[in-house]
């Protein structure tokens, strides 16, 4: 990334004596963007004590979801398990060996888990919650999982590197409708597109213009359907395909 020796956003952090966190976008729709967070603000979301269960860090640390899993568990004095491999058999064996209670994963992994024949026979009894995010889930996959694993609670997650992970409440374990919010988070729907304003958002890009409007709203580009205060993501305003959290142009 070509920048001046002193970037204004970084200098502002130095003046406050705050640490910074830099994340990189995948660069699918252009060159990768360097996303700068103020770590003091970033960590504020973890200050409120919450119940924690033993979790496996399925998502890696180059993904905002992986960082969120680690910090949430540590701040709440929980136990996080680092997997050796991320294939279906290895993940399930690791969950069983270390009595993992929460599996944060992706719809792609859950589809592979169904196709592998591991459900329900190889699903360890210790698992209480499976969360899924980073890409859209389809209703048929969720229905199959809920029917085969009636004792596991399925919960949707939502977040992005620019905003971090926001709090989500699923309407039901077998529903794709959810409420998005949390401390310092506001949402609105503009022409069926979800927009979010967050107090713990990134400071900005180091190599691109700010994506926030003058009032601080961020256009997620997620098209949503709203019912009774809950929303379901139905598509994107841009021609990008998301597979397991990795983004590709439709032409690829």
Describe the role of every protein-language-model region.
Residues 180, 188-216, 230, 236, ...:
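Conserved ATP/PPi-binding loop(s) of AMP-dependent carboxylate-activating enzymes
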Residues 43-54, 61-102:
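Conserved AMP-binding/adenylation subdomain of ANL enzymes
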Residues 103, 159, 198, 221-252:
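AMP-binding/adenylate-forming catalytic core of the ANL superfamily
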Residues 102-104, 115-174:
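Gly/Ser/Thr-rich phosphate-binding loop
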Residues 1-4, 33-36, 57, 79-86, ...:
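Short beta-strand->loop structural element characteristic of the AMP-binding/adenylate-forming
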Residues 12-14, 18-47:
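Conserved AMP-binding A3 loop
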Residues 42, 87, 108-110, 137, ...:
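Alpha-helix capping/helix-boundary segments
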Residues 1-13:
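Structural core segment of the AMP-binding/adenylate-forming
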